[in-house]
Every structure is written in C-alpha cells, then in structure tokens.
C-alpha cells in the first residue's frame, strides 16, 4: 500500500506576541491593522488614514521606532508605543561567500531558527526566503528535508526576512531624498526551508505586503513561489497571490519522482501537470519554471529529457526548465551529474525550443546553495503545548 502525503499538517503557527503584551504590527494585513488600532484607542474615522501612514513608515522607509514617525502627533506616537511594537527576526549569524552570496541564520519566536540567502547578480539581487521551520516533505536530495518540521512561520516572520535583508543591505530609502531606481534586493524566491503551499495563508499575506505599492513595492513578476506539488493550492496561488510559479519537478516518471519528491505519492505527475496547465492563464504569468536537479544516473538520461518535453507539450504548458547541478551535502545519497551530461540534457531541451539555463552554483562554500539549507540548531517536532510554553502564550 502506498503512503499518502498529508493534505494538511499537524503543525501550528505561533503568533508574534511579546512578553509585555504589545502587538507586533509587522505581518498584519491592512484590515487587521485597522482593527487593532481601533481596539487600542484610534478613532474609527481616522483608522484607515493611520494605517496608511504607519504602513509607509514600516514598509517603505523601514522605520521601527514610533517616535520617528514624524507625521503623527507626539501623543499618538506615545499611544502606539504603549500598545504596539515593530519586530522582525533576529540575525544570529551572517556568512558571506567568496561569490558575494550572503547566508543569514535568523531566530524567531520560541528560539527556532531558519536560514535566508541573498544572491547578488549583475542585473538583480535575489532573496531566498523560508516559509517553515524544517520541512515535512522529505525530498531525498534536499538537506532541508532531513530536518523535521517544527512549525509554520507567521506572516511577520516571512516578510520580516525581507526587511532584515534590506537592513543588512542598507537599502531603505531616506524620506525626502532623490529616488534611486537601482535595487539591491529586486527579487524574492520562496525556495528556502519548507513547502510554501503548506503555509498558504501566511505566505499569501506576507507576499501581499511585499507587493504593496505603498510599501516594499516588489512587482508580482519579481516574486517566484516554488512548490513540490501541493496540487489543491496551486489554483489558489494563481488567484490570491498571482506571483510566478516554479515547480520542483526533478523526475519524468512516477516511479522516480515518488522517491525524489514523495508528495508525488499523493498527487502524481499527471495530476500535477493538469494543475500547472491552468496556472498561467489565471495568474497572467508568461510561463512556469520547471526546476530539475541533475542527479548522476538517476534522472539525467536523454530519455528523461525527451519525456520531460513530452509532458510539457502534451499539456501545452509555457515553460522554462532550470537545470540545477546537485549541490552535495554531508551524507547526501546522490552525486552530481557530470558537466557534459548536464550540457547534453540542456541541449535536447534547447533544440526543442525551450529555455534550459544551467543554474550557476552560488554560495556552496557556506552551504547556502540550492538544497543545502538546514538550521544549524535542529529542533524536533514539538507539541502545541510545548511551543506555547516556550513563547509565553
């Protein structure tokens, strides 16, 4: 009997509630921020305006101190400071690769840790963020998959990773200064720790904040969500987020994908392709990215390349195929395909008319490359009662 991957998970999301009882405004939707402001003394008629002002200070200017919000009355600033706070994850370690890649280990509520990676390139700067502490999917080639799932990240902890990186890059604009169109952090990829679609609501709320035109102001075309194939949530992603989609495909037969990406036992290749075919039209995306890690003797044959093309053509999916040389980690059960084999695989796809870039490995000297992320301090799964005790809830 085959093992079914779960549709939902036995995992809790811990809200960011500080010991003194103040509410963290980071991660709240505009509607929720309006509610909490009214609950703590903001006149209802002023609440929408106040949300707009505070929102810009937090997400456009990167301000964390209410006293610095100079377009608010001094008494109101004091009132805000009494009831609210502006908190983001704490950076524990920061490693910089020889190629300029930065890897951050950040601490969140309960003492848990996640990893975040910034990858600078000539024409862009990409931040790879996490959505869960650990992961439940146990993809056999992925280092994160060896770390037990502890919990989902809150919307504050997800968008807080973006804010933390902007802090480190010194990229918050200064009010009144000339606008600089050059952005060091121009793209977000949800390709860090965890399966984003198993934490849909928090990921959606965080990305809505990142895309807000009065805040961080990233276009949805600059945000890519990578999923292993949580089929029921793919349509929701198109409708409610509308960002670009990448699929961790990695195999062309169910037999191999069941091993590499075990969620395939729940939603097989045909079910996945059917869901992917509808995504571009609903989300207005030009194409879907197929991520394909190259494993020596496992999924890298010419026959695999032709099967991959057959899948894409059969479902008429506008696609780009990202070929990823396997980044080895201690105890990994696979080896990287040879450069010649990867190039031959890419050439078959390219000759068929599809883009097939070979991803340049970045940050592997600091274990920041694709598939290498894992918290330095690993935590086992905890019960809701244990987590609540840790966080003082």
UniProtKB/Swiss-Prot annotation:
First-level EC class: transferase
A GO CC term assigned to this protein in UniProt: cytoplasm
EC number(s) from the headed UniProt entry: 2.1.1.192
Comment on bound cofactor: Binds 1 [4Fe-4S] cluster. The cluster is coordinated with 3 cysteines and an exchangeable S-adenosyl-L-methionine.
Keyword Iron-sulfur: yes
Gene3D superfamilies: 1.10.150.530, Aldolase class I
Disulphide-bridged cysteine pairs: 128-370
Cited function: Specifically methylates position 2 of adenine 2503 in 23S rRNA and position 2 of adenine 37 in tRNAs. m2A2503 modification seems to play a crucial role in the proofreading step occurring at the peptidyl transferase center and thus would serve to optimize ribosomal fidelity.
Name of protein: Dual-specificity RNA methyltransferase RlmN
Organism: Ruegeria pomeroyi (strain ATCC 700808 / DSM 15171 / DSS-3)
Gene: rlmN
């Amino acid at each position: 009997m085959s093992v079914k991957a779960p549709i939902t998970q036995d995992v809790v999301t811990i809200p960011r509630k500080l010991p003194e009882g103040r509410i963290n405004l980071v991660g709240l939707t505009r509607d929720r921020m309006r509610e909490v402001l009214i609950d703590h003394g903001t006149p209802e008629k002023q609440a929408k305006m106040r949300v707009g002002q505070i929102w810009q200070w937090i997400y456009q200017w990167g301000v964390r101190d209410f006293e610095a919000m100079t377009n608010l009355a001094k008494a109101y600033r004091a009132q805000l400071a009494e009831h609210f706070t502006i908190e983001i994850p704490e950076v524990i370690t920061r490693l910089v690769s020889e190629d300029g890649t930065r890897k951050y280990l950040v601490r969140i509520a309960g003492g848990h840790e996640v990893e975040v990676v910034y990858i600078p390139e000539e024409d862009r700067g990409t931040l790879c963020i996490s959505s869960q502490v650990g992961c439940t999917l146990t993809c056999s080639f992925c280092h994160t998959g060896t770390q037990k799932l502890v919990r989902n990240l809150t919307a504050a902890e997800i968008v807080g990773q973006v804010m933390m990186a902007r802090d480190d890059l010194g990229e918050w604009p200064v009010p009144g200064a000339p606008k600089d169109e050059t952005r060091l952090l121009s793209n977000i990829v949800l390709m860090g720790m965890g399966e984003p679609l198993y934490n849909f609501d928090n990921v959606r709320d965080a990305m809505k904040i990142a895309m807000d035109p009065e805040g961080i102001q990233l276009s949805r075309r600059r945000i890519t969500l990578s999923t292993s194939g949580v089929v029921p949530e793919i349509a929701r992603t198109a409708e409610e987020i509308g960002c670009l989609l990448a699929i961790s495909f990695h195999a062309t037969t169910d037999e191999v994908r069941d091993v590499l990406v075990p969620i395939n036992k729940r939603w097989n290749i045909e079910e996945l392709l059917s869901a992917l075919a509808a995504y571009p039209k609903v989300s207005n995306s030009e194409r879907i990215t197929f991520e394909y890690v190259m494993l020596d003797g496992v999924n890298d044959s010419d026959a695999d390349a032709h099967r991959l093309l057959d899948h894409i053509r059969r479902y008429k999916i506008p696609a780009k195929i990202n070929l990823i040389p396997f980044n080895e980690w201690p105890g990994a059960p696979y080896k990287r395909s040879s450069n010649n084999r990867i190039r031959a695989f890419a050439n078959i796809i390219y000759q068929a008319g599809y883009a097939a870039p070979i991803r340049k490995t970045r940050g592997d000297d600091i274990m920041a490359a694709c598939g290498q992320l894992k918290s330095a301090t690993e935590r086992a799964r905890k019960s809701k009662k244990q987590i609540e005790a840790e966080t003082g809830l």
